[in-house]
């Protein structure tokens, strides 16, 4: 089961990369058509920019994500002994290398894992998590994060985060260039086919970040159920994980969190209350009640 899930996540990584690159190509085509009337040229430029951006953020994913979330590295066990030793124990049980450990100074209990692979992983916990959770609950949370590391979820989410950010950057560039002076000529506005092409390009640029966000959120929701079950497998203590999730239900939003990193956390750090019919498409996590229910059925 474990190795099947790892293989499945690797296949998902390939599919996610392919899907995002298709989206990037379409955005490049739209930008190229709008501003230079060259679809191929726009696609090539977008691909080059995206590859450079992805190489930087993926190559430095841990440092980038930790800076975005104001996390401070724990250099030795003496700086945070309980957290350090729990992470060390859970890494040993999960049979992965000891990850780097970080602390986020925020009263809201939360945690996340990031990195490219188990050899370059890192976990972060808020001061609120360390203060509000007892040892069994903290073990459950860290086991959850170690499951993400072991199953290569961290690579999948890092790639999704990098590509979604690259898409947002390209769309932001297109919007700024449009207002500065990249609008179409009067000849284009008089040509019906050009008008439709322009409108289609604008619509694609507007909807692309939405599509990227929905894909990223779906990946995040799916991986949480598996990590909860993995935490129970590692600790042999379902009640510890259930109790931790119960406490997360009553947590307040984090004070300082980067929205693009929300999907990485064990629980939605922004605690957004959405009640419209399509809210589930944009949820970064499954409802905590459903996660608890699944654990109780194990």
UniProtKB/Swiss-Prot annotation:
Catalytic site: 145
GO cellular component assignments: plasma membrane
GO terms classed as biological process: proteolysis
Keywords of this entry: Cell membrane, Hydrolase, Membrane, Metal-binding, Metalloprotease, Protease, Transmembrane, Transmembrane helix, Zinc
Spans through the membrane: 14-34, 39-59, 159-179, 195-215
Membrane topology: Multi-pass membrane protein
EC annotation from Swiss-Prot or TrEMBL: 3.4.24.-
The UniProt record lists the keyword Iron: no
Cellular compartment(s): Cell membrane
InterPro entries recorded: HtpX_protease (IPR050083), Pept_M48_protease_HtpX (IPR022919), Peptidase_M48 (IPR001915)
Names of required cofactors: Zn(2+)
Gene Ontology MF terms in the entry: metalloendopeptidase activity; zinc ion binding
Cofactor binding note of this UniProt entry: Binds 1 zinc ion per subunit.
Main enzyme class: hydrolase
Residues binding Zn(2+), per UniProt: 144, 148, 224
Family matches, as PANTHER family: PROTEASE HTPX
Similarity field: Belongs to the peptidase M48B family.
Protein name in UniProt: Protease HtpX homolog
Gene name of the record: htpX
